[in-house]
């Protein structure tokens, strides 16, 4: 996650964008910074249902109990949204993820108001899947 900003910097950078075209480009840029997903991680068990695009999210717990997330999508904007979600959940334990509500951050960014309904539903599906996987680990 070293290539991605922390939560506060994400919000600052997002709010500095002059318009929604710049914000979308920033989201896409964040997606390009995600490390490449290993071929074996692009399996059906890591696929997120409820997304219009293909989405894979892998969750691993490190020795310190911190969750490490990896993901990919076949759509650039969706891959960027994955990066945004990963930034919000960065350095958290499974219980932290279960307890943390990302929606206020999306509201601060005015993110959901500018996504198509299918993208918003896909974003919710990603969050539900991450929280469910975290709950199983906590």
UniProtKB/Swiss-Prot annotation:
KW Amino-acid biosynthesis (keyword) present: no
- Active-site residues are 51
Q: What's an example GO cellular component term for this entry? A: cytoplasm
* Superkingdom classification of source: Bacteria
Localization recorded for this chain is:
Cytoplasm
What pathway annotation does it carry?
A: Cofactor biosynthesis; iron-sulfur cluster biosynthesis
Q: What InterPro entries has UniProt attached to this entry?
A: Cysteine_desulfuration_SufE, Fe-S_metab-assoc_dom
Q: Name one GO biological process term.
A: iron-sulfur cluster assembly
Alphabetized, the UniProt keywords read: Cytoplasm
Family, similarity comment: Belongs to the SufE family.
State whether it acts alone or in a complex, and with which partners, per the record: Homodimer. Interacts with SufS.
UniProt-listed HAMAP family: SufE
Its biological purpose is as follows: Participates in cysteine desulfuration mediated by SufS. Cysteine desulfuration mobilizes sulfur from L-cysteine to yield L-alanine and constitutes an essential step in sulfur metabolism for biosynthesis of a variety of sulfur-containing biomolecules. Functions as a sulfur acceptor for SufS, by mediating the direct transfer of the sulfur atom from the S-sulfanylcysteine of SufS, an intermediate product of cysteine desulfuration process.
What protein is this chain from? Cysteine desulfuration protein SufE
């Amino acid at each position: 996650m070293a290539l991605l900003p922390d939560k506060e910097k994400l919000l600052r950078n997002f709010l500095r964008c002059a318009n929604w075209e710049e914000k979308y480009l920033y989201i896409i840029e964040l997606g390009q910074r995600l490390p490449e997903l290993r071929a074996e991680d692009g399996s059906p068990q890591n696929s997120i249902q409820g997304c219009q695009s293909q989405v894979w999210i892998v969750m691993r717990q490190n020795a310190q109990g911190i969750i490490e997330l990896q993901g990919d999508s076949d759509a650039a904007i969706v891959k960027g949204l994955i990066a945004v979600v990963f930034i919000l959940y960065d350095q958290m334990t499974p219980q932290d993820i279960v307890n943390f509500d990302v929606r206020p951050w999306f509201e601060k960014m005015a993110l959901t108001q500018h996504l198509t309904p299918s993208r918003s539903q896909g974003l919710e599906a990603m969050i539900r899947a991450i929280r469910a996987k975290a709950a199983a680990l906590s």
